[in-house]
Structures are given as C-alpha cells and as structure tokens.
From Swiss-Prot:
Calcium as UniProt keyword: no
Pathway connected to this protein: Amino-acid biosynthesis; L-proline biosynthesis; L-glutamate 5-semialdehyde from L-glutamate: step 2/2
Protein name: Gamma-glutamyl phosphate reductase
Entry keyword set: Amino-acid biosynthesis, Cytoplasm, NADP, Oxidoreductase, Proline biosynthesis
UniProt lineage: Bacteria, Bacillati, Bacillota, Bacilli, Bacillales
GO MF annotation terms: glutamate-5-semialdehyde dehydrogenase activity; NADP binding
Family classification: Belongs to the gamma-glutamyl phosphate reductase family.
Cell location: Cytoplasm
Principal subcellular localization: cytoplasm
Length: 415
C-alpha cells in the first residue's frame, strides 16, 4: 500500500477515536501545539529559510515568496490563533434543534465531526497549522497535502505538531502530511472515497478548478479571490482612497485583496486622476479600459483576460461605468463570488448592490480585507468557501461538522 492510501486508512481509524475525545482533551492538545510551535520556532524558521532559498534559486515571484515566508511574528500569530480557537465553543455534540412528535418520539439534530478531511493547498505554510488545529478542535482527522514549494516548512510544522500530540491523549496520526508532492499523490487524494469524507482545496484558480473537475470525493470549494470595489457617484473621496489603497496594497498576495476597481464616471471625473496617481506612487500597475486610458495615458490597456485575473500582486484593473447596473453586471460577470464592496452614500444603491451581487461577502464602505475567519470572530479558518452548498464564506468550526438525528422512544413501532 502506497503512502497516500496508507495514510487514508490510518486517518479513518483515527477518526473513530477522535469522535470520543472531550472538548477539554482537544483543547489540551491545541494548547500543547501552540506551546511547541513557540519552543521550536528556530527549527521551523531554519526549514522555512531552506525553502525560501530554493524558491529564490528557482526564480519564484516576490508574491509567492511572501506567501511562503515565515517569521517569528507570523509564528506568534499562528499561536494566537490557536489560543483563540481554544476559547471558542466546541460545536461537536451541540443540539441544533429538538422536537417531540405526537407519538412521543423525541428527535434531536446534533452536530458531529465530518470524519476525515483532506486538505490540498499551495504555498502558505500557515495553512498547515490552521487546518490541523481546526480539524482537531472539531474532532476530525486531517490529511494534508501541500505544495513542493512549501514542503520543508510543512514537514517541520507537522513534525512539531506530532511531538506536541505525543504528550496528549490525541493520536499523532490525527494530523498527517503527504510528503509526495507529485501530481500522482494529488490524483490519488482526489479519488480516495473509501477514506476521505471531504476534500478542501485552498490555493489559486488552477488548483481549485482541477480539484473540482477531477475529484470524486465531496469537495468544499474555496474559490479564488477576483474581488472588486465599486466607487459609486456619491462615494466620499477620502474613504474611497483609503479603502482602495488598503484593499490593494496592504497585502496584495492574499485572496481578499482587490483585483479591479469599478469607478462611476462622474466620480472618476473629479477624483480619478488623483486616485491613479496615489496608487502608482505605491507601486501599483494599472490596467484599464479605454475610458481610464483617456484620463491617464500611463495606464496599460486591459485585455479580456485581465478582467478575469486574480493578480495576487500590485497590479490592478480599472473599469469605468455610467451606472450601478453596469457595475453590478461587470462584477457578476468577472467576479469569483468571493468578496465585493461598494463605496456609496446612496442607500438605495447599496441595497441594490447587496441584493444583486452574487458573492460570499458583500461590503458597504469597508475594505474586502476583512473576509477572514479571525476578523469575523471565528478564530482560525480553514478557507473561504465560494460555493453555495454546505457552507459559504469564511469556514470556521461549524463548517467542519455535519449533523445526525438522535431519536429517543419508549417502544414505539410504526403502524
């Protein structure tokens, strides 16, 4: 039996053990992981540096290197996320609803773990910690399959997690990493129906599309973030500037950063040139339609592909429109149903935007950068779902549970 199947089989066995663990036992394991990550920070950073140096030698982009990079502060942030997770209510065993039938049967709908979660993801080693700890908190076994670019960091983090779990009542194999990063191992994971209850892809559009297209196991789709901000005619100038600059430049390599600004022509006539200048001073490359080019000749003419692209860098597309209806049509055509924002003082337009735009998170007068489990108060998240079944938006603890019905009687038979 090869590595992937062997780990799948073991995960299925471990999941049956995890469902018996109490909240306190799971929280003790999480606390041990948080402590161990701090104790072994130097080891993790050493392995991360090894991966970064290999990435530079291979010519990785700055945005990819940023996603791969770990620092002492990022590891501290991971542990803070775990501590927040410990404080969150455990959804497992929670009664979702309860009622009694006329025949005396008492019916309860209860939350239960999904079982075995497969996680396939690119670049970010912090996902290794997020996925492992959220799965443990919800009583799920997890099989992790990261990318070759992050293999050194991922192996180090999982080794640290195993050393932490060894001191607790949870099996070390509750968290397993597939070290084979070839396409063959991914394809096996896609079809491991006997062992996986759900597969969650987290990464770029190509990875997600491949998983959705090829997997036979149930998939929780975490879509790419082709996010937009629409600046309505009535938008406050300073607010619009602040939100656009934050949503694009604070951390351009993440999925909740914006990739296109849609400007109402009347607002752009007054403030567009100044906005473009402000963005360019911050290193942003602008790609716009003909109307944008007429305002600023340094803007590159946007191609059809640009409207579809999640740049994950300091590149921003610019679209000018004459109405909110045109803005909504553009966003619904090219958006990835992740996060979309409107900056406006017109409540009627805001309401129209909220009703008409199809996305997991919609914002009024705020940056899209808040689409995040911790910012929503969920603690660490396992991803941001852009699909409509099971769960949508940042996936916190309840997203990694299912339900079952528990029926109590006193001898009832069906007539």
């Amino acid at each position: 039996m090869n590595e992937v199947l062997a780990k799948g089989k073991r995960a299925k066995e471990v999941a049956m053990n995890l469902v018996l663990k109490s909240t306190s036992q799971k929280n003790e394991a999480l606390a041990a992981i948080a402590e161990r990550l701090i104790v072994e920070t130097a080891y993790i950073l050493e392995e991360n540096k090894r991966g970064i140096e290999e990435g530079k030698a291979k010519g990785f982009s700055d945005s990819l290197l940023d996603r791969l990079m770990l620092t002492e502060q990022r590891i501290v942030d991971m542990t803070e996320g775990i501590k927040q997770l410990i404080e969150l209510r455990d959804p497992v065993g929670e009664c979702v609803s309860a009622w009694e039938r006329p025949n005396g049967l008492s019916i309860q709908e209860m939350r239960v773990p999904l079982g075995v979660v497969g996680m396939i993801y690119e670049a970010r080693p912090n996902v290794t910690v997020d996925a492992a700890t959220i799965c443990l908190k919800t009583g799920n076994a997890v099989i992790l399959r990261g990318s070759s670019s992050a293999i050194h960091s991922n192996k180090a983090i999982v080794a640290v997690i195993h050393r932490a779990l060894k001191q607790t009542s949870l099996p070390q194999e509750s968290v397993q990493l597939i070290e084979d990063t070839t396409r063959d191992s991914a394809k096996q994971l896609f079809t491991m129906n006997d062992y996986l209850d759900v597969l969650i892809p987290r990464g770029g559009k190509q990875l997600i599309d491949t998983v959705v297209r090829e997997a036979s196991v149930p998939v929780l789709e975490t879509g790419a973030g082709n996010c937009h901000v629409f600046i309505d005619e009535t938008a406050d100038k300073q607010m619009a500037f602040d939100i656009i600059i934050n949503a694009k430049t604070q951390r351009p390599s993440v999925c909740n950063a914006i990739e296109t600004i849609v400007l109402h022509e009347k607002w752009a006539e007054q403030y567009g040139s100044e906005l473009f200048s402000s963005l360019k001073k911050r290193g942003v490359e602008l790609r716009g339609d003909q109307k944008a080019l007429a305002m600023d000749s340094s803007i590159v003419l946007a191609s059809e592909e640009d409207w579809w692209t999640e740049f994950l860098s300091l590149t921003l597309a610019v679209k000018l429109v004459s109405s909110i209806e045109e803005a909504i049509h553009h966003i619904n055509t090219y958006g990835s149903m992740h996060s979309e924002a409107i900056i406006s003082e017109n409540e009627e337009n805001v309401s129209k935007f909220f009703v008409s735009v199809d996305a997991a998170a919609l914002y009024h007068n705020a940056s899209t950068r808040f689409t995040d489990g911790s910012e929503f108060g969920f603690g660490a998240e396992i991803g941001i779902s852009t699909q409509k079944l099971h769960v949508r938006g940042p996936m916190g603890l309840p997203a990694l549970t299912s339900t079952k019905y528990v029926i109590r009687g006193n001898g009832q038979i069906r007539k």
